[in-house]
Amino acid sequence: MKMNQLLEAFWYILPAYFANSSPVVLGGGTPIDFGKKWRDGRRILGDGKTWRGFFGGLIVGTIIGIVQYFLLPEYYGSLGIAIELAFLLSLGTLVGDLIGSFIKRRLNMPRGYPAVGLDQWGFLIAALCFAYPVKTIPTGEVLFLLVITPLIHWGANIFAYKMGWKKVPW
């Protein structure tokens, strides 16, 4: 795989990365599950998933796509496609993260507890699925993202921890 293909894969997924990380800074407030519990007596999602974080991530990810369009318009072809793709990547990311939290609560994993694989790939796979109708990337680029995303995820978590945005470095 050529370097420009690796950069293109990274460029493609950038709105998802921003949507996934921005709730750490923008979140707080009312939990998406409103404090309700599932049939197993555990919270549906937990306090870490809030409406402010969800919509903040959606907005930030979409804005990243708009900025990308103005930096490299030929990649998207139109502003409308850039907005649609960034929105779907961001929405998929956030929905994938919610699904991951739901699964973690069912497994009785506490908030913030690392779930290797689920935390790193759940949002990525959901983002790629949501964006599929608008724009896809070659299989090699998807595989590259599956390899690089855990490294970026862990690095971003350590950075957020050192900045005081997260209580734990994972």
UniProtKB/Swiss-Prot annotation:
Pfam family, one: CarS-like
Name of this protein: CDP-archaeol synthase
Record's bilayer topology term: Multi-pass membrane protein
Function of the protein: Catalyzes the formation of CDP-2,3-bis-(O-geranylgeranyl)-sn-glycerol (CDP-archaeol) from 2,3-bis-(O-geranylgeranyl)-sn-glycerol 1-phosphate (DGGGP) and CTP. This reaction is the third ether-bond-formation step in the biosynthesis of archaeal membrane lipids.
Key word Lipid biosynthesis present: yes
One Gene Ontology cellular component annotation held by this UniProt entry: plasma membrane
A molecular function (GO) term: CDP-2,3-bis-(O-geranylgeranyl)-sn-glycerol synthase activity
Entry annotated with the keyword NADP: no
Similarity remark: Belongs to the CDP-archaeol synthase family.
NCBIfam families (alphabetical): PRK04032.1
Gene symbol of the encoding locus: carS
Transmembrane intervals: 9-29, 53-73, 79-99, 114-134, 140-160
Catalytic activity: 2,3-bis-O-(geranylgeranyl)-sn-glycerol 1-phosphate + CTP + H(+) = CDP-2,3-bis-O-(geranylgeranyl)-sn-glycerol + diphosphate
Enzyme Commission (EC) number: 2.7.7.67
Signal peptide span: none
Protein's GO biological process: glycerophospholipid biosynthetic process
Cofactor: Mg(2+)
Primary localization class, coarse: membrane
Annotated keywords: Cell membrane, Lipid biosynthesis, Lipid metabolism, Magnesium, Membrane, Phospholipid biosynthesis, Phospholipid metabolism, Transferase, Transmembrane, Transmembrane helix
Pathway assigned in UniProt: Membrane lipid metabolism; glycerophospholipid metabolism
Native source organism of the sequence: Pyrococcus horikoshii (strain ATCC 700860 / DSM 12428 / JCM 9974 / NBRC 100139 / OT-3)
UniProt-annotated location(s): Cell membrane
